[in-house]
Structure formats: structure tokens, C-alpha cells
């Protein structure tokens, strides 16, 4: 779905990965990150967010919590990072990244609370008084932690398993109780998703969750609370920032916006350019169909099922001219291989380049950040696993 836009807007990335793979510098089963384009995307998002009075906290899980990317994104103007869980927080902290937001979507387990406190996140979201008390109990004397309340109202939208929080109608009482806990300072509100892609209009629209947190903010202001942070994640990129800022949002958390892989980026030219591909290799044939190594063939299902195609070849021009449909294993199966439709142009050892919306952290793929693509001098900045740890590839 994203391959067409990748070829139109960043064909240099395809050229680079084919050459690097054929030169044995990057492995099969690898997400390749175009660092130059990611930096460009983050700069424009940071500039727009700051212009609109908002903080920019990018999400890094979908690019494998990669430490090289963390450092590049922070230098490009991000105010910190949202950490979806403690695994995110550890990798980002180790890479020298500032933790802007923790506890949303995944709350911090009790045994890890002290470790999280030591990382000093700027904001920490809680779903209950019990989780707030765990933070309060773990705080050293004199350390203040700003906490956000995850809230919900009837009719709000959630992915299955993401539900939870405080009832929105109780928000004034919630804020007062959180403020009263030793070391805690009530700072604001969070929900997810506050935006989703609408297939009918092919645009991003706010969910009811968005109105829930904005109405709760009004109640808090009527009760005398000021400087209320509003965290509004979900399908976020710079084209939404002006309206969100005017509505009162103070924190945005682009993930796929950073790599140009939100649903709208697949359909039209947005400010952010594509900056990520999945690379594999043809390894064998069976009944005239080519098989390519899997491991990272998880496609985040933001669209209904669609025909998946890839560029295949041993040099860039050949690969860009040889676009072949590939059958990806069902998510219920282990993706040992992708199976291509019959095409006489495909050869064993050919590079395979896919363009799809990835979630590297749920796969067993490598993650390879590459600098210098924009200048025509691509350089591999290391080969990492999908949890952000550097590997010794091709050795152990």
C-alpha cells in the first residue's frame, strides 16, 4: 500500500537498500530506516508543533526502539519521547533520550516503579489511584512527579485491551486526590485514540475521546485548575497540529507520522516523506514461485486486506521495474517466508523491498539505520534487533 509513494517520493531509499543488501552490508529480514528523511520529518513536525504551542513526543516502538534513531530524533527537535511500556523506556533512557511521557498505553508494573521513577519522566499517566500511590510511595523525598489522568466516557473508542482509566465525570475529584498524594502533581489528561483514519472520507478524524478530554479540561478550569496538559495521540502528523493546538492540545505523539507511514501518507503527498522499508532476499523456488525470508512480515492492519507487492532485483533499476505480488502469511502463522506470485524475472539472491506499515517491536526482524541516503553516500549505522540492542551481525 505504501510502496507506490515510496517509489514516487523516496526512490533513493530503495536504490540505497538494494545496493547495500547486494554488498552484504545489511541482512535479509531487516527494517531499514532512512535517517536523513526521519530527521527532516521530525524537524518539520517539531517546528509546527512548537509554533502551535505543543510539545512533540515521538513514539519509537514501531522502528524498534532504535538508539541511533532516538539520538537523531532528539537532535532534530523532539521534546522527549512517549514510551509505550517499560521496555521502551529502558531503551530510550539508555540511548540518552528524554522520557516525555510514560504509563500510556501500558502502565508501569509495580516492581518496576522505582526504576521508572529514577528515569524522571516529564509526565506519567495513571489509570487508577492504586497505580498513582505506587508512584507516590516510590518517590524519594523532595522529588515531584507530574501525573496525567487517563479518562473515559460512555461512547469513547478503544482498541480491544486498551480500555481503562477514571470516569470523566469524576475528573475534578480525581485531580484533587492525585494532587493530595505525597510527591504527585496533577498535570493533565490523556486518552487514546483521539484520532483515527476514516476509510470513507480517507481523512483523519477525531474520535469522541478527543471531545471527552477537552470537555474534562473545561470542568477542571471551572474548578480553578490551570496549565492543564492535554495529551491527544493517534494517527498524528503535522497536518493536524494547527487545529489541535487551537483546541487546547499541548502534547502530540507522532509514530508513523515520523516515517511517513500513516494511512493518509499512503494515499496522498503529505509534508512527511516515506522513511522506512522492509528488506528481504529471495532464497529458493517451489513450483516456480519464489520464496523470500520472513521474520518481519507483520503488516499493521490499518487498511482492509490489500494486494501486497514488493520490488525484486539485484540492482536498483531492475528492482524498481520488477514489482511482484507476494502472499504474506496470516498473522496467526509464523512468517518464515513470503511467497511471490510466479515471475520469470526473479532470481535467487535478489533483494526484496517492501513498503508497508510496520511495528518492528512485535517482530524478530533486524533494524538497520542508514545515514547519507539524501547525499548519495549511504552508510550503515549498525545492525540492531527489534528491541533496540546492537547485534554482531553477521556473526553472533
Question: Where do the model's predicted regions map?
Answer:
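Generic N-terminal amphipathic, Lys/Arg-enriched alpha-helix
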Residues: 1-8, 12-33
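Active-site loop ensemble at the mouth of alpha/beta enzyme cores that anchors a bound cofactor
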Residues: 238-316
